[in-house]
Each structure stands twice: as structure tokens, then as C-alpha cells.
Amino acid sequence: MYETRFDIHNIEGDFYNVEAPENNVDSIINVIIGDIVSAKVNIDRSDRSFPANVAKKIEHNMLNSKRRIVLQYKSYSSHIERAYTLAEKNIINGKQSAMELLNGMYCNSLDKYEIDSFEPDIKKVRQHADDIISDVIKQLRKFVYSSANVTQYKEQVEIGLNVVVAHAFVECCVLENPNNATN
């Protein structure tokens, strides 16, 4: 039998050899994803149209490659609304808390691209729109998988992540609202 041995001589900074406490806390987003992925959905891949207000937002933010997650969302839109309604019944401020979390992740992404989150430069947002969405999904993935109540299959979680972020996009918590545009 082989054995791996490590000799650690010096540890600088805080070192905890226990699971992080935030990993033992349930996540509202996981409840939402669980409700979304447990719904029976008929996906029409031939319908690539968007409602006018969503198309306007896609165009305003110049979203390109990540438009596909909005198409994914379209198939699940009624289910996500139902999931948030259920969350609101069971968790005080459930939807608001989830939307605030997603908006915070959006602001973190803006910071990565040196975009002021208080008054975002729409030209810079447009330049990085797809990357910003990807980064929000990445942050949300890390958050979801480190929560205590991950109960779905990985494939379902990945779909749920896309749908939740696309919903936040449609709700104007991620990327910019064309109705607030000055240019």
C-alpha cells in the first residue's frame, strides 16, 4: 500500500482544517433550482423569439453568446415564477433575497471589469456583457455547490443556474435596464 506524506513546516495566516460554516447553511437559490428542475417542461428549440421587452434588453446590453440562456429561461419562465412564489410563502423575503444576491454578484463582475457598479458605463457593460453573465453564473455555481441543500443532479443544477441568471437578467438585476438608459 502506498501512502502520501506531507511535511508542513510553516503556515502563515489563518488555517482551519474543518468545513467552512457557510457550507452548512441552506440556500434559497437551491430551493428555486430544485423547484425549477422538478417541473415537467416542454422545450421548443425551434422558437427562438423573445418577448419585446426581453429583446429590447438583449439589444440594449448587446448580449450575444449568452442569449441562449434567455432561450432556456423562456421554457422555464412560468416554473421559476411559481418557484419564487413558493419561496416567498416559506422564506421571508425569499425572492428579494435571491435577487439581491444575484445583483451583488453582478456588481462583483462589474468590479472585475473596472466598471463602476453605482453608475455603470453602458459602453463597457456592452463590451463585456457575455463575460459578465458568464462570471455571474460562475459565482452562483460556487455559491450553490457550497450550500448545504444541494439535492439535484449536476446537469439539473447547471440548467437551473442558467435559468436563475437569465431570470435575473429579465428582472433587470443583472445587466442594465434599457428603460433607465441615458444613451
Question: Where is each model-derived feature located?
Answer:
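Long, low-complexity intrinsically disordered regions enriched in small/polar
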Residues: 1-34
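Long, low-complexity, intrinsically disordered terminal regions
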Residues: 35, 39-183
